């Protein structure tokens, strides 16, 4: 058999330098691709002594083709994107290499040092065999209403995670998850792989993480890539434009780890009416979870009906605090499908759990409402909270408009517990429930320490007169 003829041409070689001053967010290098190219390889090399985070993205005449990042690396760092028909490297999207003007983008996420870089583009022309036909995608979830627990923040090796999509999905099943959102930074290259790991027992949601210079956000339930590069001061494409584009696809915009220091939320121009989801418990953020919970209450009191969720932010689904299954978002969905789960997230039929289960409803004026729903005034409000799988003595708090309303201490026990409360003086706003483990030795009366969190409900809203 005759070996394929391979011809490689250098289309671009650029040497440059980044430095802390002047502050530049993106560097753009255009190059021309001739007809007949079957594969393209774009490489960025730089040396990092302390902190120099550079990310590589490539855009063709038809749009976005991928992003590569390696934020933890030190020393000599190499980022590579390669693609062609039926072929793509990690972070890249497969497809024909179009002739015309292409663009390589260097995202200077942060740097406190001067660093030299080398950007090269290599065009390869060779005869490629026809791609093997693919079979139908597996069933993504199943019909039937229920309460489903899962993960809304996870990464694979297509961005800065360690695991493949198959390993991530396998871990989700092993640790009892029923749904999984893939939120790789910038890129959608893992979508086709994670969808192939779905089944009747595991629904997957196509998402990505906007990784900006002033904060991160998960874009959930997308049908196509949304441009997450919002830090060009000369561009009208900003964080609010991204949220509107996500909504135009029927997706949800969620703010991540808002108090994570330099990775926290600093888009002060953000219109909070565009926010659908907010991480109130992030498994890696530890004490910052208290600030996130307080900030969320501020949003709720301001009238923003934002759904509170949890995130593991898993980069290695079997290791340490990144291991899946240590914290869940539980959704009361019409079906275990992407559409059903997004519907539950949209209205706030959800709670955060680190193990136990809850059922939370309220009654007023002859009507009953669950989390995310609203009851009218006037009249007393009766609150019903069912708890199960309590393996610790717990303290249960009922919060009213973000402030303490009442609390109850319960012993450990395997039996289900039903708590019924009445508020004879309700006002417009909301109620939500919190459950914390009670340490055997504690000299603090309050009992809302972040490290003892077990359950956080979403609100039941109280409106004006019917």
What is the predicted role of each segment?
Residues 38-41, 93-114, 427-432:
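Noncatalytic modules at the cell exterior or secretory-pathway interfaces
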Residues 1-48, 121-129, 134-145:
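Solvent-exposed, flexible loop/coil segments flanking beta-strands in beta-rich domains
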Residues 28-31, 80-81, 91, 415-424:
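Exposed aromatic-hydrophobic patches
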Residues 156-304, 321:
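Catalytic cores of extracellular degradative/oxidative enzymes
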Residues 57, 127, 131-143, 212-229, ...:
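Charged catalytic cores and adjacent phosphate/nucleic-acid-binding surfaces used
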Residues 52-54, 112-124:
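Edge beta-strands of jelly-roll/beta-sandwich modules across compartments, strongly enriched
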Residues 148-161, 312-314, 433:
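Histidine-centered catalytic micro-motifs
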Residues 7-22, 44-89:
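Surface-exposed beta-strand/loop patches in noncatalytic accessory domains
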